[in-house]
Structure formats: structure tokens, C-alpha cells
Amino acid sequence: QPQNLRRFTSVESYFAYNLIDVNQWGNVPWISMENAFRFCSSLQVSATDIPNLAGVTSLANMFESCVLLNSPFNLNAWNISTVTNLSGMFRFCYSFNQALSLWNTANVTDMSGMFEESGFNQNIGNWNTSNVTNMSKMFKKAISFNRNIGNWNTANVTDMSEMFGSAAIFDFPMIFNQNIGNWNTSSVVNMSGMFRNAKFFNQNIGNWNTANVTNM
């Protein structure tokens, strides 16, 4: 492995489509994985080891548009305890549906668009979301997702816009229908389109504190 390699990005690069596999992560002390495999539409990961993310704060858009990605590459064992940004990490990963329940998300502040238009439907109800401020578009058009996330700590979230929404009435409807009535929404300012086209959602959210909401 190159001795000075600390960061990798494929965004808008010529070889993105031709990158088809990561077979080993090695001992590289990464400083960022932001945009690392973005638009690598043929990518799978066969590596059995895990990357060294001890110095990484952003995984934003790491696998965005990796439309075939769904190989079981020990993702659940990744140490993301230093990560603050997960925005768009699996956006447009239509095939992706791997376990992430063991992730330490205690320091994450941004989960916007994380699973947007992905095939994800795994248990993440135990995630620590106490520091998250942005959940906008987190599950937008993630039409398979229907898991219990009712115990999430949303006290610091300010943006939930389009969180469970779809773009238009012609899209496949969201099937999400879980009890999130106990969420603390006292900090939320933006809820615009939060349940747009969520035709199956039928839960009581009447006790939500919407005192600070300016956009519904």
C-alpha cells in the first residue's frame, strides 16, 4: 500500500465505473472517506478486514450511487465512533441492505439523505442520535424501510424535512408505519414534506412539540 495514502475519492473521476471491488482495506490510517466511492456503480466489497477510521470524521457520500453494492463486507464491525457526518452515505444504493445495528453513532450530527433511495431495511433502532441535528431526506424514497426507530433521541434535530417523503404521487409510496409519537421535536424548525406520499403512515403524532417549526 502507498505509504502516504490517507484519503481516497472517486467523485467524477474517469475510473469510477471501472472500480468493481475492494478486496482489502489494509492498515491505512484514513483521514476522510467522504466521496470515496461515489458513482462507482459497479462496486462490490469483498474485503474481510475493516478500514482504520480512527482519524475519520466524515463518511458523507462514501457509497453514493453504488447501485449494485450489497456484498456482506463486515460493515457492522466498522468503528465509526469519531464520525460526525454520515450524510448521503448510502444514497441511491438501490441494492444495499446490510446490518448496521452495532454502529456507534454518538458523535454524528448529520444523517441527512443517508439512506435516500436505498434498499435499506435493517434494525437501527438502538442508534445513539442524541447529537444529530439534521435528518432531512434521511429515508426519502427508501420505500423498503419500515423499522422501529421510535426510541431515537431527536432532541437536537432541527431539520426533518422530507425525512420519510417521496418526490411525487407517481413514485412508489413509502411503507413506513412505525410509532414515533414519543419523539422530542422541540428543536425542529423544518418539517416540510416530512411524510409526503407516505400513504401507509398512520401513527399518532399529536403530542409532538411543534412550537419552533416554521415550515410544514
Describe every region a protein language model picked out:
Residues 1-215:
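Negatively charged
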